């Protein structure tokens, strides 16, 4: 068996998420179907570093899979890239160590979240940025977002129903900028892992702070209380991008 590691990007608009589901179109299923075709019917399972939800996009998702036969990496990348649907792109592909695991090898992820604050909104970007038409104090949000940096228990920012018991994560960087060309707000979060809907819940809380409906200290309050009810609403998935994954040596 030869293990392969690939970096892929995808437009999440028409996917029900990354992970295979019954009666739903997913990124995992489309890639596995293509690999099955390329290998003459072998059943191949891929493993992703991040499990993105419906409508969420990726610039730099990492996957791995095993093939019985050794293939030229660039030829395999080209075949996968050209035979998967147009909303999936295979950026790079290489042979990996036998013990490499896309999800469980220690890594840092970076997520980006785009918010269209235009009035009116840009209809061409409706699948790629979340629209927020209400007044916002950007400086307030830039001050509040700093409270997310560090090692915290993020229970108050995760969705109900998660099976993960340890909710302590480290965020190494959290920033908010405004794109000078589009005017969109760009929230960027880097860390050693993120809980289910954590990024979207953090963005939803920051937007409420920017709109004056929550105080600037609310981030600290949610972290200390671990109370989801004190956080803002979950921002829509269409503004979220899995930007980059970096593995430790």
UniProtKB/Swiss-Prot annotation:
<dbReference type="InterPro" id="IPR020095">
    <property type="entry name" value="PsdUridine_synth_TruA_C"/>
</dbReference>
<dbReference type="InterPro" id="IPR001406">
    <property type="entry name" value="PsdUridine_synth_TruA"/>
</dbReference>
<feature type="active site" description="Nucleophile">
    <location>
        <position position="53"/>
    </location>
</feature>
<keyword id="KW-0819">tRNA processing</keyword>
<dbReference type="InterPro" id="IPR020094">
    <property type="entry name" value="TruA/RsuA/RluB/E/F_N"/>
</dbReference>
<dbReference type="InterPro" id="IPR020097">
    <property type="entry name" value="PsdUridine_synth_TruA_a/b_dom"/>
</dbReference>
<feature type="binding site">
    <location>
        <position position="111"/>
    </location>
    <ligand>
        <name>substrate</name>
    </ligand>
</feature>
<dbReference type="InterPro" id="IPR020103">
    <property type="entry name" value="PsdUridine_synth_cat_dom_sf"/>
</dbReference>
<protein>
    <recommendedName>
        <fullName>tRNA pseudouridine synthase A</fullName>
        <ecNumber>5.4.99.12</ecNumber>
    </recommendedName>
</protein>
<comment type="similarity">
    <text>Belongs to the tRNA pseudouridine synthase TruA family.</text>
</comment>
<dbReference type="GO" id="GO:0160147">
    <property type="term" value="F:tRNA pseudouridine(38-40) synthase activity"/>
</dbReference>
<comment type="function">
    <text>Formation of pseudouridine at positions 38, 39 and 40 in the anticodon stem and loop of transfer RNAs.</text>
</comment>
<dbReference type="GO" id="GO:0003723">
    <property type="term" value="F:RNA binding"/>
</dbReference>
<keyword id="KW-0413">Isomerase</keyword>
<dbReference type="Pfam" id="PF01416">
    <property type="entry name" value="PseudoU_synth_1"/>
</dbReference>
<comment type="subunit">
    <text>Homodimer.</text>
</comment>
<dbReference type="GO" id="GO:0031119">
    <property type="term" value="P:tRNA pseudouridine synthesis"/>
</dbReference>
């Amino acid at each position: 068996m030869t293990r392969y590691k690939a970096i892929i990007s995808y437009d999440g608009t028409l996917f029900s998420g990354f992970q295979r589901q019954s009666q739903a179109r997913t990124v995992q299923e489309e890639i596995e179907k293509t690999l099955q075709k390329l290998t003459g019917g072998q059943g191949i399972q891929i493993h992703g570093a991040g499990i993105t939800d419906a409508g969420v996009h990726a610039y730099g998702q990492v996957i791995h899979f095993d093939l019985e036969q050794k293939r030229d990496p660039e030829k395999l990348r080209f075949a996968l890239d050209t035979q998967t649907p147009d909303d999936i792109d295979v950026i790079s592909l290489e042979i990996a160590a036998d013990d490499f695991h896309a999800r469980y090898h220690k890594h840092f992820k970076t997520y980006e979240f785009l918010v269209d604050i235009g009035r009116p909104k840009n209809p061409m970007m409706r699948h790629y940025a979340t629209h927020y038409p209400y007044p916002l104090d950007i400086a307030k949000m830039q001050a509040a977002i700093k409270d997310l940096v560090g090692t915290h228990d993020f229970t108050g920012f995760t969705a109900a129903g998660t099976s993960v018991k340890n909710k302590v994560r480290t965020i190494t960087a959290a920033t908010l900028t405004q794109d000078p060309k589009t005017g969109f707000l760009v929230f960027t979060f880097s860390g050693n892992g993120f809980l289910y809907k954590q990024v979207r819940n953090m963005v939803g809380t920051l937007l409420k702070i920017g709109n004056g409906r929550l105080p600037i200290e609310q981030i600290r309050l949610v972290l200390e209380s671990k109370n989801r009810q004190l956080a803002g609403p979950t921002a829509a998935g269409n503004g979220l991008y899995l930007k980059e994954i970096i593995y430790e040596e």
